[in-house]
Amino acid sequence: MDKILTAADAALRTLFAQPSAAERSPAAGIAEGELTEAQRRLSGALMRVNHVGEVCAQALYNAQAMVTRDMVLREHLLEAAREETDHLAWTRDRLNALGDRPSLLNPLWFAGAFAIGVVAAKISDAASLGFVVETEEQVSAHLESHLGLLPEEDRASLAVVARMKDDEERHAAAAREAGALQLPPPARALMRLAAKVMTTTAHRI
């Protein structure tokens, strides 16, 4: 019951509360750039996509933590979720600064990622960690692409994305060291397809 309550609390905080970061945002102290309206809309759309990614990360980690019976792994997953909360707050702050909003479909994205996390964790802890590795690697690659898409004048968003990319790579490495199982190619391809649908939709909605 405690695990279920923890997961429910995480869902409510992720979807409906203003997230609070434990660590100072990489954008702190960086002056807002002079953006054209088109650049502002582009930055807002890209940061909305990144915010959705962090919503999904919260769902994935908390679902896996709810299911696993390995208390060491559970604490590892919850710690990763706490670190991802910083990303959630940073991306939300950038959306606010850019005059944009989170995706209206965040509850749907959260539910889908939570379901994937539960299924993966029920297969095995190694499979669960394999999903973490694949997710973090895909997110890292996505963030890398955003570094080339964001307007160079938006130095605050660029700083946030660069730091997030470093953190995601560290999370993937930690999951591999914890015994992650490499996912079969069909599973990785399906995850890439789902990510494509999510990012394309979140860019607009």
UniProtKB/Swiss-Prot annotation:
Pathway the protein acts in: Cofactor biosynthesis; ubiquinone biosynthesis
UniProt name for this protein: 3-demethoxyubiquinol 3-hydroxylase
GO MF annotation list: 3-demethoxyubiquinol 3-hydroxylase activity; metal ion binding
GO BP terms in the entry: ubiquinone biosynthetic process
Protein family membership: Belongs to the COQ7 family.
Function: Catalyzes the hydroxylation of 2-nonaprenyl-3-methyl-6-methoxy-1,4-benzoquinol during ubiquinone biosynthesis.
PANTHER family: 5-DEMETHOXYUBIQUINONE HYDROXYLASE, MITOCHONDRIAL, COENZYME Q10 BIOSYNTHESIS PROTEIN 7
Membrane topology: Peripheral membrane protein
A Pfam family per the record: COQ7
Gene Ontology cellular component terms for the protein in this record: plasma membrane
Record keywords, A-Z: Cell membrane, Iron, Membrane, Metal-binding, Monooxygenase, Oxidoreductase, Ubiquinone biosynthesis
Gene3D superfamilies: 1.20.1260.10
Binding site for Fe cation 1: E54, E84, H87, E168
SUPFAM superfamilies the UniProt entry points to: Ferritin-like
